[in-house]
Amino acid sequence: AKGKKVISWNPGWNYKAGEVDMMQMWSFRGKVTPGIPHIDSKFHYTNHFDTFADLVALYDRKIYNLTEQTDDVVGSIVALWHDRLLSTEENMVLENNFYPSMLALAERTWLGGGSQYYDGEGTMLWNENTETFKNFAAFEKRMLIHKDKYFQGYPFGYVKQTNVKWNITDAFPNGGDMGKVFPPEEGLKDSYQYEGKEYGVRSAIGAGIYFRHVWGGLPTSIPTFYKDPKENHTAYAYTFVYSPKEQEVGMWAETQNYSRSEMDLPPKQGTWDYRGSRLWINDEEIAPPTWTATHTTKSNEIALGNENC
């Protein structure tokens, strides 16, 4: 009517071909109805995204597991549903990594292709020899050129991550004791013996490594570093940082990806989180910052503070 077209959510009403102009698949339950054009936004909700890890999955994914457009699958969007109160409009763009996500999906939808859907390698860059890594590293280089050339003065928090390499242990069972000490604290090795069992070490690349994704409990979980992460376990991750000179630098560190649509509480002062996480640099323990948010009542009407990097 009046030249307007209607887009409806899927899942939603069970439309038949000819009853609606287009549908947006917003949930993992969404499936194409033949004869209706669809937009794919499954797991594209940037308000749940980590700045680094989720961008890998977003760039590498096939649109609805297809390599090119069809009559029934015509494109894709990122969705930003920020349910927490905001102190400034700029924070909505910055906290949800909007511009990097926009550029990643714009290139993917323009080129088509991709090597996986969200349930392939997920958010992981395992090693430099894979096509996934090479393609993402090339995109990252182009994106950072755009950041310097076209996004000066805009809230664009992303920095290079393809040079960040980690060694991460298998998770040790802690029996609910989050302060329990395990062999990696005595010295770093390629593997560890603990209570008659061997615990290995694997490598991963990136500035954000999920041990368990926010969508990890869904029937179609997004894969992370651990295939089947369990509660009451302790893991160790370590990396090498080189400085060509003695200097003071800032540090971007977080142990939890704060969704901007949940009522998560800030950590208690003097702690990194509610899981007993700890950080060291050259064997010197790093204390957490003073958290700017101090509320103890869960609410979407209280803005996130500096606990949300």
Identify what each model region corresponds to.
Residues 143-225, 291:
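Accessory carbohydrate-binding/adhesion or oligomerization-edge regions at the termini
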Residues 226-243, 300:
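Short beta-strands within extracellular/lumenal beta-sheet-rich domains
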Residues 240-283, 309:
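Aromatic-lined ligand-binding clefts that engage carbohydrates, nucleic acids, or primary amines
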Residues 285-287:
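Short hydrophobic beta-strand segments in globular cytosolic domains
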Residues 293-309:
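Short, surface-exposed tryptophan/glycine-enriched loops
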